[in-house]
UniProtKB/Swiss-Prot annotation:
The keyword Cell division does not apply. Belongs to the class I fructose-bisphosphate aldolase family. Signal peptide: none annotated. Its EC number is 4.1.2.13. This is Fructose-bisphosphate aldolase 1. CDD domains: FBP_aldolase_I_a. The keyword Signal does not apply.
Amino acid sequence: MASYSQFLTKAQEDELRSIANAIVTPGKGILAADESTGSMDKRLNSIGLENTEENRRKYRQLLFTAGADLNKYISGVIMFHETFYQKTDDGKPFTALLQEQGIIPGIKVDKGVVPMAGTIGEGTTQGLDDLNARCAQYKKDGAQFAKWRCVHKISSTTPSVTALKEIASNLGSRYASICQQNGLVPIVEPEILPDGEHCLARGQKITETVLSYVYHALNEHHVFLEGTLLKPNMVTSGQSFTGEKPSNADIGLATVTALQRGVPSAVPGVVFLSGGQSEEDATLNLNAINQVSGKKPWALTFSYGRALQASCLAKWAGKDENIAAAQEVLLHRAQVNSLASVGKYTGDASADAAASQSLFVANHSY
């Protein structure tokens, strides 16, 4: 049945619903390969490689050619603008390469977070001015979904009501609506940074508050929820919290409770960001989330960047002779997160120190 909105035809709604459901196919998740040029500078410098366009292309090619098993675990890939238009060594566009593997191409459409006037250290996301034209072109060039990241911080004064309203409106009234009108499934990402001294309970409460503002805005602007996905943080304590560290089960329960209180059942799926957790913690916590009993009407899976790529990048080290070994590492991380997305991960006895290393970056930006 079509929605009450007159902004989309039934055919448009059907296409959006189909794409969203395909992305959250059971046992599959998203590879977030949408790091900006600046973020890639940090990644490549960590292995002693210069941050050139060619090195960025070679690294993304390594990821996207990991082998026939990649599409068993990965349903979609989010790309940065540069990556979206790059090609393999033999001239095949990355978008075509992914489509041939049955993997859905996606695109990061925000242009980063900038300071928000009238707030204490909070930010808003830029990129709305030409978004309609860019979405139309990306759809024409093969994209089927998009991502827009907004950021909240937890402190004694934040998030402010000003930021809550601005970010919700940013995500709902313009970004999501524009994407849907151009045939792109909008992934809504209201990230709450893990920075801070807050306990798990405060992290849960702030997550619930953020979600309530976001979905109020989405509904107010007639966004077709069945054709959207949510990319939230998991509920954790702050990185500087000095109390007892919450268990995986604690994190799972707090996260699911926040979702139950704030995310409509019409939303097909929740694709979690890893938020600077170690690769292994991101997998264990995703598994714990899926093992929580009770009502969970959405698919609960992953949209990981660093938590899928960190060990892979280290193994590659910029050397051609390491490509195959690095791809094996990527496939392994994808496989264990596939298991976690259906609550069947039992731990990784082979996990090395790299997989357990925290990937937290203070005030992280993409």
